[in-house]
Swiss-Prot record:
Protein name as annotated: Esterase OVCA2
Catalytic residues identified in the record: 119, 177, 204
Enzyme class, broadest EC rank: hydrolase
Keywords annotated in UniProt: Hydrolase, Serine esterase
BP GO terms, sorted: response to retinoic acid
Length: 225
């Protein structure tokens, strides 16, 4: 019997998450998937001002190290470094730099079997795969995608996510998520053919308790042979 393949997954952080902080936030999931998947974390290219960052993002009053600097993938206002997933916007300022960051990671850190995104990172992961499905050579389609607290990105000039996505997908979201309400994640899931959903009773985080473990493993095991 052939040894089980360890899947490599590029994980895109949420808005206002540092690379180190995102690694810590995915620690429970990393433990759950030990031996099944290697998670490679990536944060956005744009520093988020300290005034807009969560309290306690940096360990002291000095400047953040690159790994501790809260970052984002794009901003939803032209003049301010802020982001709202729920407000209608005509702006995705910094999105091209975000796409370049992901393309560079795929090229230099890959190959990867799948993509995982959390919150704003989930919206970006879905957009990246839509671009890949449309033929963008920077983004070869992965074998699967996992979207946690995802949403359809607003402000895109092209309605690329209107086309059904044929990529195998797992959509994870909380019933009491106040940052990204569950209906936003369900709307994103509806853009994927044969989408698998995993719901939990909590809020805005990546669940990895024993009750969710089997759902992750069942989804990933189909790609491990």
């Amino acid at each position: 019997m052939a040894a089980r393949q360890t899947l490599r997954v590029l994980c895109l952080a949420g808005f206002r998450q540092s690379e180190r902080g995102f690694r810590e936030k995915t620690g429970a999931l990393r433990k759950t998937l030990r031996g099944r998947a290697e998670l490679v974390c990536l944060s956005g290219p744009h520093p988020v001002p300290e005034a807009a960052a969560p309290e306690g993002s940096c360990p002291d009053s000095g400047p953040c190290s690159p790994e501790e600097q809260p970052r984002g993938w794009w901003f939803s206002e032209e003049e301010a470094d802020v982001f709202s997933a729920l407000e209608e916007s005509t702006v995705c300022r910094g999105l091209q730099e975000a796409l370049e960051t992901v393309a560079r990671a795929l090229d230099t850190l890959g190959p990867f079997d799948g993509l995982l995104g959390f919150s704003q990172g989930a919206a970006l992961a879905a957009y990246v795969c839509a671009l890949g499905q449309a033929g963008d050579p920077r983004f070869p389609l992965p074998r699967f995608i996992i979207l946690v607290s995802g949403f359809c990105p607003r402000g895109l000039k092209e309605p690329i996510l209107q086309s059904p996505m044929s990529l195998p997908s797992l959509h994870v979201f909380g019933d009491t998520d106040r940052v990204i309400p569950s209906q936003e994640s369900m709307q994103l899931a509806s853009r994927f053919l044969g989408a698998v959903t995993l719901t939990h009773s909590g809020g805005h985080f990546i669940p990895a308790a024993a009750s969710q473990r089997q759902a992750y493993l069942k989804f990933l095991d189909q790609f491990a042979e």
